Amino acid sequence: MEGAAWNTRAVRLTNDQCWGHLAAVDHGVLCTGGPRGAIDAVPVCFVVVGKVIASPIDTVKAKETTELGRLKNLEADATATLLCEQWVRFDWSRLWWVRAQLVRRSGHDLTVTLREECEDALRHKYFQYRGVEFADLLLFNVKSVTGWAESDDPDALRRAMSGEGAATRY
């Protein structure tokens, strides 16, 4: 495009920055492979415990059943992708995204301690889960993380993660 100025500040995030964003963000979109090759994407709550990502199947939010499509998909194919992002319409210097490639941990790969740590972390992060039992808990090993940010300015990244100066008009 004639006259277009390309942004030379945009950067690929380091592994540590990706993990920092994953730990701080409040939700993401979990993508699993559905029937006939379709991708099923669903917003999820999650926590990072060490290098494990945990997402609950709860009974807090209204749903017809706890036998969700993502569970069926993960039984057929244990791989998934978690996408987290921040979009600030009026301040593009704060745009970022992180993608984690995941593999579901199987039942024999779970320890009681890890499950309890993840449940405690979920209850600490999301007050709605305090005093509530989970129907199930999806635990994932992270194969890789990658991410992008509009700016490599550490202050812009800090502001983006803290929500500082967020636009309030729409």
Which residues make up each language-model segment?
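Charged, gly/pro-rich active-site loop segments
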Residues: 1-13, 87-170
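An N-terminal domain-cap segment
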Residues: 2-48
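Amphipathic alpha-helical interface surfaces
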Residues: 18, 66-70, 114-118
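A generic structural signal for short beta-strands and their flanking turns/coil linkers
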Residues: 26-28, 42, 49-53, 76-80, ...
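Short, solvent-exposed loop/turn elements at beta->coil junctions and helix N-caps
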Residues: 31-35, 85-90
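Short glycine/serine/proline-enriched coil/turn segments at secondary-structure junctions
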Residues: 36-38, 63, 90-92
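A short mixed-secondary-structure module that forms the rim of ligand-binding clefts
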Residues: 47-88
